[in-house]
Amino acid sequence: MFLVNLLLMIIPILLAVAFLTLLERKTLGYMQLRKGPNIVGPHGLLQPIADAIKLFTKEPLRPLTSSTSMFIMAPILALSLALTMWTPLPMPYPLINMNLGVLFILAMSSLAVYSILWSGWASNSKYALIGALRAVAQTISYEVTLAIILLSVLLMSGSFSLPNLSTTQENLWLIIPAWPLAMMWFISTLAETNRAPFDLTEGESELVSGFNVEYAGGSFALFFLAEYANIIMMNAITTTLFLGLYQNPSLPEFYTTSFMIKTLLMTITFLWIRASYPRFRYDQLMHLLWKNFLPLTLALCMWHVSIPILTASIPPQT
């Protein structure tokens, strides 16, 4: 039964990722006053399926000088971790109801760094290695702020469990009292998923394609799926943390529908940002984090720790 549940979670995620690629191409197309893909199927709806067939039927090339086992393992690990991160997410019920769901997601996203590092190192290409080192530095840096912001939100919620957040936000979305945290969280998720304007790892002008430059066909598709699964995942967490979802036990469909709509709107915002902003310079990216976000998030975290301690000493006003 667990296997059936697992498949019922994985297959929709992969389908969502497939159609997110189409949505991205269509959105960017219309923002640049053109149509986007419209040949394969009605209005280009079958384009992702055609792309998948093309990629998975190509010959899996690998460089002669590469470390074979690592080269093959890296994309598999990337996708496995991207899909594993979904397990504690309440939609409205999680696949595994974890007591420390937030901690699990943080740990899994930290492990994703290894797949990037392996792919860059095993490719035995200078472009791939530079891209991988950039990606690792960027991901590790922005995880610091993500963890501190999560801690601040969890202090308001009072629990590490994700379903508790919907109970916390029954009367008021957390984005309203904690909007600076929400803004910093959103920008950090952009950087964490290597999206524009922080897509320095795949800077076409200087690094060809970043850490996946030597990958082709199926293995490239696995990295691609992992990247887009992480984008949807991050937006789903943003929705759960800040755009509270009212859970009515008699109408679980309502929760799922509102969750889906909010996540979709957040994802479209990601695409909109990609169409609008140029790429950051690498030093600007690091300055933004270490000199702006980190002091701010630490200050806000201390604020959220001190307020309950301060108010605990006030006697109840009866």
Curated annotation (Swiss-Prot):
Q: How does it sit in the membrane?
A: Multi-pass membrane protein
Q: Name one GO cellular component term.
A: mitochondrial inner membrane
Question: Major place of localization?
Answer: mitochondrion
Keywords assigned by UniProt? Electron transport, Membrane, Mitochondrion, Mitochondrion inner membrane, NAD, Respiratory chain, Translocase, Transmembrane, Transmembrane helix, Transport, Ubiquinone
Q: Does the keyword DNA damage apply?
A: no
Q: What GO annotations for molecular function exist for this entry? A: NADH dehydrogenase (ubiquinone) activity
Localization, per the record, is: Mitochondrion inner membrane
Catalytic reactions on record:
a ubiquinone + NADH + 5 H(+)(in) = a ubiquinol + NAD(+) + 4 H(+)(out)
Q: Where are the transmembrane segments?
A: 2-22, 70-90, 100-120, 140-160, 172-192, 217-237, 253-273, 294-314
What processes in GO biological process is this protein linked to?
mitochondrial electron transport, NADH to ubiquinone; mitochondrial respiratory chain complex I assembly
Q: Which Pfam families match?
A: NADHdh
Indicate the quaternary assembly: Core subunit of respiratory chain NADH dehydrogenase (Complex I) which is composed of 45 different subunits.
Q: What does this protein do?
A: Core subunit of the mitochondrial membrane respiratory chain NADH dehydrogenase (Complex I) which catalyzes electron transfer from NADH through the respiratory chain, using ubiquinone as an electron acceptor. Essential for the catalytic activity and assembly of complex I.
* Assigned protein family: Belongs to the complex I subunit 1 family.
Mind telling me which HAMAP family this protein's record contains?
A: NDH1_NuoH (MF_01350)
Put simply, this protein is called NADH-ubiquinone oxidoreductase chain 1
Question: Which organism encodes this protein?
Answer: Emballonura alecto (Philippine sheath-tailed bat)
Its taxonomic placement starts with:
Eukaryota, Metazoa, Chordata, Craniata, Vertebrata
